[in-house]
Amino acid sequence: MITNNLVPTVIEKTAGGERAFDIYSRLLKERIVFLNGEVNDHSANLVIAQLLFLESEDPDKDIYFYINSPGGMVTAGMGVYDTMQFIKPDVSTICIGLAASMGSLLLAGGAKGKRYSLPSSQIMIHQPLGGFRGQASDIEIHAKNILRIKDRLNKVLAHHTGQDLETIVKDTDRDNFMMADEAKAYGLIDHVIESREAIIK
């Protein structure tokens, strides 16, 4: 989830003295999960582990999932998406900066009524990308698989946005960028927020 080794440390004073946390561990104490950067196996596994941990800590308390991501691997992202749907706590999603490709699907997959974006953020939907080399028979297998994946992703977006499948298919044919207010009108998010008080607890 972190693209370089510079991770801020937070010093917290307790009755027993001072404790140092990296910033992401400190946010986790507040039930905040942060996806920063590309969706890949490593970042997805970290997010999944945090979601499962927070469910075990309190299955009735919301989780806040902040997303600033250009997207990435479909299989890794769908693992996060399925976990969001599987666990008991509502997962509130908040876009800060960019939620593109798989990032936009994770944003839309948050609990209904609890999907947010800051006003200057951008959201982008499109069809999955594929580039395969090898024998013709293998290319054919991969082509069929990516069409199945495309159909699955379109159905997920249709479910969460309320758009009909035909509209989703047309709108994801090419990169489709939206500002926060456009994403709200489309059904990818529920609220455009300018202050923390606007987030539903």
UniProtKB/Swiss-Prot annotation:
UniProt GO MF annotations: ATP-dependent peptidase activity; ATPase binding; serine-type endopeptidase activity
Principal localisation: cytoplasm
GO biological process terms on file: protein quality control for misfolded or incompletely synthesized proteins
Catalytic EC class: hydrolase
Disulfide bonds: none
Compartment list: Cytoplasm
InterPro entries per UniProt: ClpP, ClpP/crotonase-like_dom_sf, ClpP/TepA, ClpP_His_AS, ClpP_Ser_AS
Summary of subunit composition and partner proteins: Fourteen ClpP subunits assemble into 2 heptameric rings which stack back to back to give a disk-like structure with a central cavity, resembling the structure of eukaryotic proteasomes.
Main function: Cleaves peptides in various proteins in a process that requires ATP hydrolysis. Has a chymotrypsin-like activity. Plays a major role in the degradation of misfolded proteins.
Protein name: ATP-dependent Clp protease proteolytic subunit
Organism: Francisella tularensis subsp. tularensis (strain SCHU S4 / Schu 4)
